Curated annotation (Swiss-Prot):
Pfam families: tRNA-synt_2, tRNA_anti-codon. Residues 309-312 are annotated as: Aspartate. Disulfide bonds: none annotated. Keywords: Aminoacyl-tRNA synthetase, ATP-binding, Cytoplasm, Ligase, Nucleotide-binding, Phosphoprotein, Protein biosynthesis. The lineage of its organism: Eukaryota, Fungi, Dikarya, Ascomycota, Taphrinomycotina. This is Aspartate--tRNA ligase, cytoplasmic. ATP binds at R331, A332, E333, R339, H340, M341, E502, G551, L552, E553, R554. It comes from Schizosaccharomyces pombe (strain 972 / ATCC 24843). L-aspartate binds at E287, R331, S505, R509.
Amino acid sequence: MSEMEKQVENLSLEAKNEKPKEVILGEDGKPLSKKALKKLEKEREKEQKRKEREAREAEEKKKREANEIDYSAGKYGDLPLNRSTARPGRTYTQISDISAKNDGQTVLLRARVYTSRLQGNKMCFFSLRQKYDTIQALAVVNKDTISKQMVKWCGSISLESIVLVEGIVKKSPEIIKSATVQDAEIHISSIYVISPIKKNLPFLVEDAGRSEEQIRESEENAAEGDSKFVRVNLDTRLDNRVLDLRTPTNQAIFDIQAGICQAFREFLLSNSFNEIHTPKMSGASSEGGSNVFKIQYFKTDGFLSQSPQLYKQMLIAADRERVFEIGPVFRAEDSNTYRHMTEFTGLDLEMAFNEHYHEVMEFIEKLFLYIFKTIREKYAKQVAVVRQQYPSEDFILPDADRIRFHFKDAVKLLKEAGYRKQLVPGQKVPEDEEFHYCEDPEFDDFSTPEERALGQIVREKYHTDFYVIDKYPSSVRPFYTMPDPEDPRYSNSYDFFMKGQEIMSGAQRIHDPELLVERMKALGVSPDVGLQQYIDAFAIGCPPHAGGGIGLERVVMFYLNLPNIRLASSFPRDPKRLLP
């Protein structure tokens, strides 16, 4: 093939492979003119040059930062895992102890990163948290100690990380509303991560600590374009309970709960009580009912304790005179209400008396007043923290030492308010009025709506949230309850109430074996082998005695107006929850 023929063939191939020229259409759908095309081409070249320039500048900035001396090196970063290799003995400060009075002082503290905000590349704000105390801290770039690299790193610290911060306290010129320390802030000199976050948080602690009112208000404002707060439901919180327990509200709740236990123990120890520890597994159910957890105990059946009732009484028969216990109580009740759990903490006591069971009832009244006054005087700060999320009115204590009602007098108060109406067989009652009726108005136990109504009546009429109802009907009390000697339809028993909610049930116990067996049979409880040793304890002599059992979580719930009893338990148990 000649050279000319080759050139012709190549031209032919190029023609076949040549792509059609791009046709650019204008807004009118027609091809652009040459003038318009030229203008578009210039704009494209200009845009391309801009991108190339920005890329060069970014690369140059990166190189400058890499070559820039970090004069804060060693003042920030992740600390190695603490394996207790050294103990320098430095002095640490609590956030609660910091105020404007410390202006100019250097402090060292360990805290969690509650919130953070990077402002440009020269400033980072933190809210540092210890339990329910928070303080604002900031790292600001300067020429000598705080570098841009340090501030940038500060902005990368994950929320809930535990940090070691050293800084100077500065009096704030304005009130810092977002922190509990409102008149001072910390200007950071050094900051290290002690314990980083190694998984994504299921929710923010800040979100879990908001009140229902705050959430609703944000949802209403969202319609106007504002962002709304995240609603963290109770199940999500309980599924991730360790994180949830970090909220300031929960920290305050469980401080108060611990304070109640301490006050209970202090008062009883100062009145010659002995702390006891009874078995939580037994061969018989203490109440003689079916609401017990049955367990396999080697080759026989056992039960988880419903209460320490039987053992408290046996210890009284053993001359222990005054005993108390703080321990777990198990109830196999398939109830999913806001006020029931299958495991809770019981504050139980039992004591011998000399003449009348009212000696014990009066003592328990004084015990409760001591507990309530302890909360009011020593835990006012914690109560205020809880009220930010769960608003409540002050708990009203009676002007006198006690407010008591006979059961039939409480029934009378309810009748006057339109409750306790006789339910006639076959009578149709409106659904919204069902709780106004009962089969036996004089002797039926109070329903939950009736208890609440009575609480409101007593509050308005007697100006108290704390009161006692005495002489409950024998038919609604356990077999070991002493009948009223004057009217056996009633019993020597009592319930204590807070805001119309029962928090303690107690009574004089039967300490005569024959009467005890008689009552057991009358109520359908078999005095079998499982209860025989309990009965025998009274056959060898036992002083008259009375006592009661307090539900710890209920006291916390009702005092703080919590919407659900699960909020008063660190790791609640109910029919649907056995973890965590």
